[in-house]
Amino acid sequence: MHQSLIVARMAPGAAPDIAKIFEESDRGELPHLIGVSRRSLFQFDDVYLHLVESERDPTPAITKLAGHPEFRGISERLSAYVTAYDPATWRSPKDAMANRFYQWERDNRS
């Protein structure tokens, strides 16, 4: 399972609006086209955390579908609520991705 964690800033009180945008989008074809199998949204003060889970790295599909009407639409709708974590250093979506520096999994051997 591949996981990507997107980090950004979010407007105060915007969590319900952001959730609604994704709820509507997740009923469409976009998650299937990108390969998303699970999405979780988190908030810590004004920090927006978006965990995307998929069978493989979705970056190539996201790059390919960046011009797709649904992708552009969700990006435009989110722009009212979500901004770059550090606008001075943001150049592309990869600049919003957190870097995993540790992972542990329980050994399932009994």
Regions from the language model: what does each represent?
Residues M10-S37:
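Short amphipathic alpha-helical segments
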Residues S40, L51:
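Short, surface-exposed charged micro-motifs
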Residues E29-V36, E55-S92:
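An amphipathic, aromatic/His-enriched active-site/gating alpha helix that lines ligand/cofactor pockets
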Residues Y85-S110:
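Short, low-order "capping/linker" segments at domain edges
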Residues R9-A11, K64, A80, W104-D107:
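A compositional/biophysical signature of low hydrophobicity enriched in polar/charged and small residues
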Residues P12, V47-Y48, S54-P60:
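Short, charged/polar surface micro-motifs in flexible loops or helix N-caps
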Residues M1-P12:
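Short glycine-/aliphatic-rich beta-strand segments at the starts of folded cytosolic domains
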